[in-house]
């Protein structure tokens, strides 16, 4: 008598992030320091007000597996964001990759930072060879159908924005600071400033009032500055009160002899 193994559901039988490689030997690393810092600034300022923290996931340079029919194919966006009810992992179980059929939610935004070696791939200008993966543009537009796709060239400070309309990316017109995304109540624009002691033009998120969203470090500095300002105001008030007291005591000391001459004893 033999025991029959229970049948797995189709979803249980699919490869997960534990079955798929999270890195590939021979893959090039980050092309420059900008590709490290810019995603960090995007992550630190991406706070959609209508989504709780546990429904927001962002990543950079993480394998994004997108096609179950070709389960080994992946793209590695410079930065992407996922919104909605996300798969739960315990605190010690970090994502190795983002596998769309395992997660159940596709990215909402993808951002690519152009470099000479990836520009044609990112802009959909490469031809697909037989039995080879499609380029990023095709994956984002036609397979994952990511609603918003942004491309930034740090060499020319050129910023391109695309929105998905009728299953095709259409250019979006930059207005004011950048592009306003009503669904998440955030805008993405170009900010001139210093981040990690690097002064240049950066991509950064802003709120409905046009205020650039602060990074945690900036928020902490702002809090510390306000605390110092309040402390300085208290010290100034105490100093002024002490000065008034000293002036009053000096005036009493000046008037005391005159009053005594008039027969008035203050003691």
Kindly label every feature range from the protein language model.
Residues 32-60, 67-80:
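Acidic-basic catalytic patches of nuclease active cores, encompassing PD-(D/E)XK
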Residues 58-61, 148-150:
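A short glycine-rich, hydrophobically flanked beta-strand micro-motif that places a catalytic Asp/Glu
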Residues 84:
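Divalent-cation
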């Amino acid at each position: 008598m033999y025991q029959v193994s229970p049948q797995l559901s189709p979803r249980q039988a699919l490869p997960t992030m534990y079955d798929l490689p999270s890195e590939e030997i021979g893959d090039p690393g980050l092309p420059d320091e900008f590709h490290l810092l810019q995603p960090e600034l995007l992550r630190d300022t991406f706070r959609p007000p209508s989504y709780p923290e546990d429904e927001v996931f962002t990543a950079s340079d993480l394998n994004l597996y997108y096609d179950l029919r070709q389960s080994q194919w992946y793209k590695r966006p410079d930065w992407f964001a996922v919104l909605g009810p996300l798969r739960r992992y315990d605190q010690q179980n970090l994502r190795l990759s983002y596998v769309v059929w395992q997660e159940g939610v596709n990215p909402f935004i993808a951002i690519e930072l152009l470099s000479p070696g990836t520009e044609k791939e990112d802009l959909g200008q490469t031809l697909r060879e037989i039995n080879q993966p499609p380029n990023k543009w095709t994956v984002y537009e036609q397979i994952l159908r990511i609603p918003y796709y942004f491309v930034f060239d740090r060499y020319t400070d050129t910023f391109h924005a695309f929105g998905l309309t009728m299953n095709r990316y259409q250019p979006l017109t930059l207005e004011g600071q950048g592009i306003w995304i009503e669904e998440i109540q955030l805008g993405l624009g170009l900010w001139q400033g210093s981040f990690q002691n690097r002064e240049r033009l950066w991509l950064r998120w802003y709120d409905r009032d046009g205020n650039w969203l602060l990074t945690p470090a900036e928020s902490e500095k702002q809090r510390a500055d306000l605390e110092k300002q309040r402390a300085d105001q208290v010290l100034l008030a105490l100093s002024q009160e002490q000065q008034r007291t000293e002036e009053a005591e000096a005036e009493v000391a000046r008037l005391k002899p005159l009053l005594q001459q008039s027969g008035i004893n203050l003691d």
